[in-house]
Amino acid sequence: MDNRNEKLAHNLIYNSISLNENENILVEVIGEDGLELANEIIKQAKIINAKPHLNIINYEDLRNFLINATEEDIIEYGKKDYEIMKKMQAYIGISAPTSDKSLKDVSQEKLELYNKYYTALVHLEQRVKHTKWCILRYPNKYFAKKSNMTLNGFKDFYYNVCNVDYNKMKIAMEPLKELMNKTDKVHIVAPGTDLTFSIKGIPSEKYYGTFNIPDGEVATCPVKNSVNGYITYNTKTKYNDIVFEDIRFDFINGKIIKATAKEKTKELNEILDTDDGARYIGEFAFGLNPYINNTMCDTLFDEKINGSFHLTPGMALEESDNGNRSAIHWDIVKILRKEFGGGEIYFDDILIMKDGKFILEELKELNAENLK
């Protein structure tokens, strides 16, 4: 066993979810590579007399189920796991896929039904709102290949980003949170991007190892009807096992009225047509993890890239709620560092970030070199 899993499990139990005696915790492993960490979490949960429950989801089994399932089957599957989740006080989800095509051959229609009747019910409505939760990946050959690293090299990277000094990060985030809470107008200018929106009256929140590992975000949400202009994202992103790049959104009064993504424009618009809320924004956040510099086409890592922000179509964050509701929540990242084209972010006409670096004195501790 990799001894670093012991430290990671400890951080998850005591820092991320603050598990207590007699609490039910669901440890869910999606892909069997994550069992080593899951077993360590269960071991440490038992030490404090919590009640761990293990659920293993095999990607191939899920794929076969969805291919053959009726809409009613998917509805019943969601109801069953919803009832299980209602009994939990805590949740840790470990994802360890072995392929980019884990759900290959599943139709877009079935994936949309799964998102609507399973993901939205079990996770967005119950797990996110009513449990102490944290989700993470597990370092395996698949993630190493995606990152163009050796397995050992990726493991070293992984444990660095997951076990960063989150207490230091938490303190450094406070001035940004306070500034966002006082800000009305946000203006973002970058290649292919000229976007304005208001965050007035929407609470901001710090994320420092509590919901995601790796972590590092300060997030809020635009006032629902305030987004105007256009944005062109400069990272690849995956949704429903489809990889998108060069996504551009055009907004009028909060709504995405035009969406393009090279040859995947049709698929992009099908996702945005999931429901009315999918064409409105549910999150605006800064990525702040000092060890994550480049995209992996994996949201859990990419949304934490230092010198980046993400603007998220779909369901609003509970902590920063603008009232938008949707079955989707899709964090799409734009990196503002100079090597990615640069860019500027203004709060109430004051420049706060240029080329991925905070320039206000009170925010400079959040720059990558100061968080390591």
Where do the model's predicted regions map?
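A short, compositionally biased
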Residues: 179-185, 243-245, 336-344
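Short, glycine-/Ser/Thr-/acidic-enriched flexible segments
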Residues: 32-33, 97-99, 140, 202, ...
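Oxyanion-binding "anion nests"
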Residues: 217-260
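Active-site lining segments that contact anionic ligands and/or coordinate catalytic metals
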Residues: 228, 244-246, 253, 279-283, ...
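Dual-mode signal for accessory low-complexity, basic/Gly-rich regions
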Residues: 258-325
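Active-site bordering "gate/hinge" segments
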Residues: 1-229, 366-371
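Internal helix-turn-beta structural module
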Residues: 296-371
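Short aromatic-centered micro-motifs
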Residues: 188, 250, 345
